[in-house]
């Protein structure tokens, strides 16, 4: 394929990527990308991923794990590639699994519960911040147990199915 055709095909792929999402979703992805692009060079690289994991409390991430993540990208991860990768992952994704995976980032041991105080801190200080009222509503609907833990697996099930697990 000629370089001109390859460029046209890439441009067409970019158009398709942006047409997969609503404008508000693209803006949310842009926020996430900006948070991850720690050195602000327009690309997510190994150091950016390491810093992002550290910010999430995972300081001992193995190089192999980061390398595996980077191998999923067809090249350097700029915003368009980032969006394309998410588009491919989310195509046909189960909403329950998607939300569970978001919680699992904060639960590296896979316990299925998180400290309510930690969730409150994350939801009020990161990305699209929850208001005090929203936090109060969430904990009124899904109160933590007596030890202060929130069963996020049950929470996700209720969010996606409207009822508690049996």
Swiss-Prot record:
The modification Deamidated asparagine is found at residue 14. GO terms for molecular function: calcium ion binding. This is Myosin regulatory light chain 2, ventricular/cardiac muscle isoform. Ca(2+) binds at residues 37, 39, 41, 48. It holds the Pfam family EF-hand_7. The keyword Plastid does not apply. It comes from the Eukaryota. It comes from Bos taurus. GO terms for biological process: cardiac muscle contraction; heart contraction; heart development; muscle cell fate specification; positive regulation of the force of heart contraction; regulation of the force of heart contraction. GO terms for cellular component: A band; cytoplasm; myofibril; myosin complex. The modification Phosphothreonine is found at residue 52. This chain binds calcium. The modification Phosphoserine is found at residue 19. It is found in: Cytoplasm, Myofibril, Sarcomere, A band. InterPro entries: EF-hand-dom_pair, EF_Hand_1_Ca_BS, EF_hand_dom, Myosin_RLC. Contractile protein that plays a role in heart development and function. Following phosphorylation, plays a role in cross-bridge cycling kinetics and cardiac muscle contraction by increasing myosin lever arm stiffness and promoting myosin head diffusion; as a consequence of the increase in maximum contraction force and calcium sensitivity of contraction force. Residues 24-59, 94-129, 130-165 form the EF-hand domain. PANTHER family: MYOSIN REGULATORY LIGHT CHAIN 2. Keywords: Calcium, Cytoplasm, Metal-binding, Methylation, Motor protein, Muscle protein, Myosin, Phosphoprotein, Repeat. Gene3D superfamilies: EF-hand. Myosin is a hexamer of 2 heavy chains and 4 light chains. Interacts with MYOC. The modification N,N,N-trimethylserine is found at residue 2. N-terminus is methylated by METTL11A/NTM1.
